[in-house]
Amino acid sequence: MTPDIRVVIPARYASTRLPAKPLALIGGVPMIVRTAQQVAQAGFPYCVAYDDERIGDVLAAHHIPAIKTRFTHENGTQRLSEVVIARAWTDETIVVNVQGDEPLLPPDLITTVARTLIEHTQASVATLATVCDAPESPNTVKVVCDCAGYALYFSRSVMPYVRDAAAPPVSYLRHIGIYAYRVQLLKRYPQLAPTPLEQAEKLEQLRFLEHGFKIAVAQIDEAPPAGVDSPEDLARVQALFVHE
């Protein structure tokens, strides 16, 4: 039986680098609305998990499904955990996490990451990667996988490290930050303590690996357009909608 697939879009008002980021206008439309419109095209039930009534008011005005969550969450996965528990979704349900600052996300990636989790029955999480041309940058998260497509490790460092020039060529894989989770894991997430590697690399997904959960990784042909993390990113995306 094919599991239910749902999409949750976490939206936090108090962004450090870009205050009130979900409400930033892109072609006259709030960013969180743009992101929700992209997600809706995938055809799965979805909702925005927000933490501030200013976001909630905008979502209501645009008739976007939403659920109010606590503002104390440290990350988007905690927010997802609150949603799946509040909605009493079954353990077999698959939840795709799309960040609220991804107004250009191709909707087909939602289907791809969900299908990856369905096909990898040993995995509790699935995510995506693509070939990386600049592995030296610590802002680019790399992933290495086993022969079955499960993640071995994620890092900001260059990996794999090629020691000898005569070694066979390897492809560096850049992680794409979209995730699919089994609800069973999200329900357990509040009990999973932060881990040393997670804290060292500042990579939330390492918590799952360190606690023994498998992450399936599907390779896609090209990276999606970058999300909005800074005022410069916002200006870049706004320029694409300048004539709307």
Swiss-Prot record:
Its EC number is 2.7.7.38. Pathway: Nucleotide-sugar biosynthesis; CMP-3-deoxy-D-manno-octulosonate biosynthesis; CMP-3-deoxy-D-manno-octulosonate from 3-deoxy-D-manno-octulosonate and CTP: step 1/1; Bacterial outer membrane biogenesis; lipopolysaccharide biosynthesis. It comes from the Bacteria. CDD domains: CMP-KDO-Synthetase. Keywords: Cytoplasm, Lipopolysaccharide biosynthesis, Nucleotidyltransferase, Transferase. Its main location: cytoplasm. Belongs to the KdsB family. This is 3-deoxy-manno-octulosonate cytidylyltransferase. The lineage of its organism: Bacteria, Pseudomonadati, Pseudomonadota, Gammaproteobacteria, Cardiobacteriales.
